[in-house]
């Protein structure tokens, strides 16, 4: 057997992987052994798409190249010998020219923080290439119009279905995708920089695309090597281990017969995508790549069915089932269902066999196993030194878990075309309809039946019922139910009995989340299937086309999460944007594209972890406590290959003499320790930092850590607000942060006609899910100095903490932040821990140290949004006017105060959007043994605004009036606004500036709204199993202006460098600052400054260059940074005016050259502070959302959302629009799907993309309309602008409120059949907490609605 290293081509360049770790992934190789940093580590699970690349393989025999997208974080380098890889830089770049995909992403304003954009670019590019390739392989299709691809608009939406973005809300990304689709109406595309609003959309104005331009070409040199080498070597030596590439099953078996391997040291791989689910706990030194065995990739078609080799990818299997399946409905529906498994770039490499092996060996909740089980599939396996066996899939799944010596060879799916009366359906319930989410339950049913002419129902002759993912070891057949149904004529009573039997079969194992919900789902799916075989079972046919709504129509199921393969849920995304542009301050006010957007799309934009590792760099990973309250007695490591890579562990004892054990500090509110010492006070607290030679070794060694705990003499942990109340465990709120009550509550309550006492609502936490996890790189320097590059929203505070921890003066510490890959508050105080830990390690070891947290550690340590429990008592008149409100609120702050004492003020501020008459509250900030909660986008305001809506809806249901009536009745007038908001409302001198009432009436008090509400009611009257709701929610949001520095320097060539205290985190700060600089210096230019835009560069934040930088938080940093820059420019203009007057008309460059020759100072620094009489102002908006809820599954589709937001005189409407849409969709996640779960010790267990589900392209509104209105000018605001970053998040509660209306309709429907929802009051008034996940919605609709309906139907027809 020969020996060789893997050879790959990356963007056309040859690389030989010599001396690399055999477990090295392609992503690690790209980022450490090549100059290409476009692929990012977002999750390490194949769940986000940030690492996507295009892989190309060459078949020398056929002289054919195949290309596909893949997750480089899962793909092992050793499996890519003689492959070509194309990254986002290879698609296009600043030197060779940007690709149309990159330019369109930039032009459609589809990149904000930019961390996800290279992966988006690769996914779109791959989809375009695949569509063009498929079209060329088929019979000659009609030519596409010039500039378009073969991609359809529907396929374009799916192209990025596996890619996550936390910033944009996806709408502009989808527009960029669909701009390539031949069937798109260009007029439907949103705001872009290619044609102005109102101009005719024209394909010729888009960056030209040609499907003949194949970027991902396969290098000729690699083809030559492949032809001459004959393929991959049998053995490849890589660093500390070996890769084996057997060419036959016999060769595979011989490897084991020679006793070279044991179960622990060897890993068998075909694609390695399983490591995204089941992480390697240790390193392996031997890998066997079975993908080179031809028999495992074979596909055989016969009259009996299709035999698919175990190493065939899921994508290839889908293609075969669609094309070779002919008229076989079973094959087509299996293919459709498989398209919901994982994401495109995972399906392209993940194998059918690997998925089934994981289901058999590791109890993986496989969709594929369930679907193939119902289809009657068989498998062929072979063990070492044994004969081949053909087993039914059911037999195989029931066997003891396979070992590494058992090889799954193929899967055979029978062809059912020769049978008459076959009905086959598959179902799955998951938070995302396009896939990329594990099912709560999946099921597949196949029945052979005949129609009974007399009854019109079907007689079941044979049936197969398969269920999976409900909490069992593997997919199962419901044999008892099958036996019962055989020979039965399908009727309500038969289905009812089948359902009762099923509930005894589908039994989730102990510890399974939402067990009752999963059983209910199984019942719902069996009901759906069997009711299609019964005649006259439902007198309300599910046909939404009969009842159109204001946004879209649909056929069958429209929910985005639980679908039958024959249902149409994927309505196209449509949108509309309305805004007013102004030329008064041009280029300020223009919707110019984001600075550096093309660089972000190409992957050339540099984030902290993209900085090349310096010589002798070490890497760190946190070891954290899994116990909520315990003494740390010691840290040891399991004996393993990973633990051998440990260099040292940095703990509290390594803090320099004179330094403090401090990891974060919020000014005036308190510190949090960097290291647990000597007691860990919460699960997830940092105990130490493992230092190793590579980041991967550090990660794996940290997993091998064994912590010795001792709980003697310690009180039990306080984990909940209830525990905190019992132990009187609270943080004090400083007087200056305490909200003030309004009016006399007791007096106002006595005037009420009606009272609600002790209403309750709970809100969970939310994780930031910035795409770039916490990261830092520390360089030790001379004289006890240190430089730290970190991803931080507060570089100045980070400098403070690092200096305190090291015990050095502040001027010894330099913090540099160029750009941040998403923040949302999570890169404020939480970023300081990583930066400080890096600094301590680098200071101690005198070597550079880098840390980039893996997603799980980041999620466990991050803290997130504050969970809370609210109780309220409210009094109101019979006409709906509220007279008094008392709020009793318990906030879970975690172990340290951090930002938490400021949360009550924010909650009450948002609550005050309504005039409550008298307002009183008792708010406790609870100290608990969980990770400290921190500021997250709209901290406190998001919760307060929602609590207000919950109260108003409770009042409305009590009075049996429309909720909008109560909302409108209790909106402020100018007088009450000033009573409730005081100084924040000082600028609202007239109704034109207090725009909330106008906005609300524009949405909710119009004939159009009444028409839509009537259509919703009509739909609900004609649809039993789907219900719609519509709701309009107003918001107010007070923001605070803070001092901000700015520095403008004009260089001798006329280029301009600008520094500001704010950090670019995706909010468009650099773009607005660039526009403001051009405007403010425009007085010196003949064209008014627009020509200066290309001369301006905003440079990175540097705490030794720009002091008093402050915080990038609170939504006002962009405008205050702009004002500081305007002030600097004003001084420069005054200084340069005499030169300009003498010089007359001159080009900018010549003019500046003259000024320089005249020794004019060409730099100016300003520190802007707000007017003491105007330090805050109000923001207003409203949103109407319409949703559809599937009563059987709890799945929700947002049919339409209309947002109107008062942006003042927008500094950049495109940027502000992106902020509004992104905030709204992030809010949708908080209010609906993002379930933040912990174990009994408070340790976060929803700690990755597999368990924590942020919104994706398939969960945003199907019709997404946004209008930015420009209200009256105000001289105290920056060019009359307003904030846009945080306030729009509150509008997402309109989705939750609409869901409540739909659920209320369902409860009314099924109250008539008895049981389940209690009395009439409970039907309309019910507690609906946050988030309203699928299980929560289904429970509120009724877990037993199927049984109740069947019982009622059977009784009425008996």
Swiss-Prot record:
Query: SMART domains in the record, alphabetically?
Result: Ald_Xan_dh_C, CO_deh_flav_C
Q: What is its EC number?
A: 1.2.3.1
The reactions it catalyses are: an aldehyde + O2 + H2O = a carboxylate + H2O2 + H(+)
Compositional bias (Low complexity) spans?
Answer: 549-561
Names of required cofactors: [2Fe-2S] cluster; FAD; Mo-molybdopterin
Recite the UniProt cofactor note for this protein. Binds 2 [2Fe-2S] clusters. Binds 1 Mo-molybdopterin (Mo-MPT) cofactor per subunit.
Presence of keyword ATP-binding: no
One of this protein's GO BP terms? auxin biosynthetic process
A single GO molecular function, which one? oxidoreductase activity
Region of interest: Disordered:
540-567
Q: Which residues form the 2Fe-2S ferredoxin-type domain?
A: 4-91
Q: What residue stretches are annotated with the FAD-binding PCMH-type domain?
A: 236-418
**Pfam families annotated for this entry?**
Ald_Xan_dh_C (PF01315), CO_deh_flav_C (PF03450), FAD_binding_5 (PF00941), Fer2 (PF00111), Fer2_2 (PF01799), MoCoBD_1 (PF02738), MoCoBD_2 (PF20256)
Residues that, per the record, bind [2Fe-2S] cluster: 43, 48, 51, 73
Q: Which UniProt keywords apply?
A: 2Fe-2S, Abscisic acid biosynthesis, Auxin biosynthesis, FAD, Flavoprotein, Iron, Iron-sulfur, Metal-binding, Molybdenum, NAD, Oxidoreductase
Annotated InterPro entries: 2Fe-2S-bd, 2Fe-2S-bd_dom_sf, 2Fe-2S_ferredoxin-like_sf, 2Fe-2S_ferredoxin-type, 2Fe2S_fd_BS, Ald_Oxase/Xan_DH_a/b, Ald_Oxase/Xan_DH_a/b_sf, Ald_Oxase/xanthine_DH-like
For the protein in the UniProt heading, the enzyme class is: oxidoreductase
Family from the record: Belongs to the xanthine dehydrogenase family.
PANTHER family for this protein? ALDEHYDE OXIDASE 1-RELATED, XANTHINE DEHYDROGENASE
Protein's name according to its UniProt entry: Probable aldehyde oxidase 1
Q: Which organism is it from?
A: Oryza sativa subsp. japonica (Rice)
